[in-house]
């Protein structure tokens, strides 16, 4: 595949950031984490990024438009973000990847990363999934449960090396 960029999405704690980081290091490609950039963008505009329901629609749209333009102008770059695979649907040279894993794995990762109880992590993940689903459906009519066509789905419940290698082989 003649991919100029790799675009990775997935629900919280699905392993999308881990995959993006692994690929970036192995391929020596630039890495852009959309969520991290969005939080910076919000702060620069005087908005608390942790209060998702208070972020104006226009802030989301402006950021996503900038990200989409950047994707279109990039080469040898990995973009990771919740809806990045939808934002890149018109880019024929993008390898688009969806990270999928089961709820137990997501909760376990949250416990390890955040130091919270399993119950708190389950609640946090459920709330985040619901908020994200509502936000992106309202903004773009994106249903996170319905992937766009042409997306490679990887099971991220196994060690990252196995599915990172699968993606690298597709680039050859």
Model-flagged regions — what are they?
Residues 92-114, 124-126:
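Conserved phosphate-donor/acceptor-positioning beta-strand/loop module used by diverse small-molecule
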Residues 166-172:
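C-terminal alpha-helix
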Residues 8-23:
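Glycine-rich phosphate-binding P-loop
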Residues 62, 86, 118-166:
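Small-molecule kinase domains that catalyze NTP-dependent phosphoryl transfer to phosphate-bearing small molecules
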Residues 30-90, 103-104, 115-120, 130:
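ATP-dependent small-molecule kinase phosphotransfer cores
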Residues 2-6, 75:
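Pre-Walker A (Motif I) flank of P-loop NTPase domains
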């Amino acid at each position: 595949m003649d991919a100029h960029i790799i675009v990775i999405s997935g629900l919280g704690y699905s392993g999308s950031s881990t995959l993006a980081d692994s690929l970036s290091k192995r391929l020596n490609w630039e890495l852009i984490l959309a969520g991290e950039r969005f939080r910076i963008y919000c702060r620069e505009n005087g908005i608390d990024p942790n209060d998702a329901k208070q972020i104006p629609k226009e802030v989301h749209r402006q950021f996503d438009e900038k990200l989409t333009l950047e994707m279109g102008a990039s080469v040898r770059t990995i973009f990771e973000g919740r809806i990045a695979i939808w934002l890149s649907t018109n880019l024929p040279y993008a390898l688009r990847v969806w990270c999928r894993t089961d709820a137990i794995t997501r909760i376990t990762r949250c416990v390890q990363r955040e130091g919270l109880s399993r119950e708190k992590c389950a609640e946090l993940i459920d709330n985040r999934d619901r908020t994200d689903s509502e936000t992106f459906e309202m903004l773009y009519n994106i249903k996170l449960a319905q992937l766009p066509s042409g997306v490679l789905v990887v099971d991220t419940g196994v060690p990252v090396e196995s599915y990172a290698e699968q993606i690298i082989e597709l680039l050859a």
